[in-house]
Design a protein with these regions (language model features):
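Glycine-rich, low-complexity intrinsically disordered segments
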Residues: 1-180
């Protein structure tokens, strides 16, 4: 096959999808302090995210010394957001209170509002947009809850920067507007 720039360009629909045209919508459960305000702010403060992946495992079966592989179960890797921190700490405080409701710092107990998964899990959506502002694809993460809030490094020599931190979430599975 000969190298053909015109064919390549003709197959690059919309000049390619751009990773900076996205939005995250993360709701917070009622056990999270200021969850409504944090949800509204996350739309603007979620600096980076991922479109999800998944893995189908294999089930090896041996037959006369030969390994045969059969399709196994699907698994999903954790989902991480990079979040910009502003001076009201609304998103971080809501994430901390959400995690504390799941398992408190001192008491090692769960908040009564978070006894069942419906009390501490929510859905989250990542939407990828085209350059004209049209929605290209969206993913709904089902049963999201926080696993990790990364520390924020402080440094007297850090000038001209805004604090950022990552938050990692577990989820049950994802659904897409284009995947059945």
């Amino acid at each position: 096959m000969a190298f053909n720039v015109a064919e390549f360009r003709a197959n690059m629909i919309g000049d390619g999808a751009r990773p900076n045209l996205f939005q995250v919508s993360l709701t917070f459960p009622t056990v999270a302090t200021n969850g409504t305000a944090a949800a509204q702010k996350t739309i603007f403060m979620a600096k980076s995210a991922q479109l999800p992946g998944s893995t189908v495992g294999t089930v090896p079966v041996f037959y006369f010394g030969r390994e045969l592989k059969f399709a196994g179960n699907r698994t999903f890797t954790d989902w991480t957001l990079q979040i910009i921190n502003d001076e009201d700490f609304v998103v971080r405080n809501a994430l901390e209170s959400w995690m504390n409701a799941i398992n408190s710092h001192a008491g090692n107990v769960r908040n009564t509002g978070a006894v069942n998964p419906t009390g501490y899990t929510v859905d989250a959506v990542v939407t990828q947009y085209g350059k004209a502002g049209n929605e290209l694809k969206s993913y709904n993460f089902v049963g999201v809850f926080p696993l990790d809030i990364a520390p924020i490094d402080l440094d007297w020599g850090s000038n001209d920067v805004i604090e950022e931190y990552s938050a990692t979430f577990a989820f049950q599975y994802w659904e897409s507007n284009t995947t059945t």
